Amino acid sequence: MTSQQAHAIPDVQNLNDSRKLAIDKVGIKSIRHPVRVSDKNGGVQHTIAVFNMYVGLPHNFKGTHMSRFIEIINGNEREISVESIEPMLREMVKRLEAETGQIELTFPYFINKSAPISGVQSLMDYEVTFTAEIREGGAYTFTMKTVVPVTSLCPCSKKISEYGAHNQRSHVTVTAQTNSFLWIEELVQLVESQASCQLYGLLKRPDEKYVTEHAYDNPKFVEDMVRDVAGLLNAEARIDCYRVESENFESIHNHSAYALIECDKRLVVGAN
């Protein structure tokens, strides 16, 4: 196809739209691409992220150019790093002639953990989502979301039972908008410190005894979990606003217990 023939193909997306309704987000979802993420120990993890990429569409455009999203994600390097997200986002907004844009990437992240007694090491995986956003006026924000699996033990069950107490695996999800760099490991450790007990990939018998007894000594309702985590998030100056959720997959019910706290510390008098 000659360049003259290419120019003759109609560009429907650039046509005016008579409905005059702007679209908040339009783009592509669920595209997989390699990424590399630096870890706190000085290493680099190579993993696969699922990307969502959106821009705001002005009311006068009929559609956006979907192929440009793919060009942008493949344009600069084979692997995308955390450091390259903001430049990529700004390029996306510019090329698509938008005022707002958002890139989300979700990936598994691994932390090497030592069992509490034997010291045997194993990997634990955590689901992490980075969200980079440009809002009207060009303001840039970065949000990190981490799902941390932990153990919770019911205080009521412990109180009313002659022996034992029901416990279960729980997911504590923290979504934090940051004003400066925060390691994934720091957010994970913050959450795990407030659980009845943290989880490990590998445990020997002395370790299993320890985690069972540790959970029994630290019973927590789902309400306790979000309040205790929120207290530490309030004290973390690098976090401007957050959402903390806890879902307990109840071992004696066929439903989950759930609690949530949201806070924009910039609006709270006396906050850091």
From Swiss-Prot:
Its catalytic activity?
A: GTP + H2O = 7,8-dihydroneopterin 3'-triphosphate + formate + H(+)
Residues under site feature: May be catalytically important: 154
One GO MF annotation is: GTP cyclohydrolase I activity
Q: What does this chain do?
A: Converts GTP to 7,8-dihydroneopterin triphosphate.
Pfam families membership? GCHY-1
Organism taxonomic ancestry: Bacteria, Pseudomonadati, Pseudomonadota, Betaproteobacteria, Rhodocyclales
The entry's keywords: Hydrolase
Q: What is this protein called?
A: GTP cyclohydrolase FolE2
- GO biological process annotation, one example: tetrahydrofolate biosynthetic process
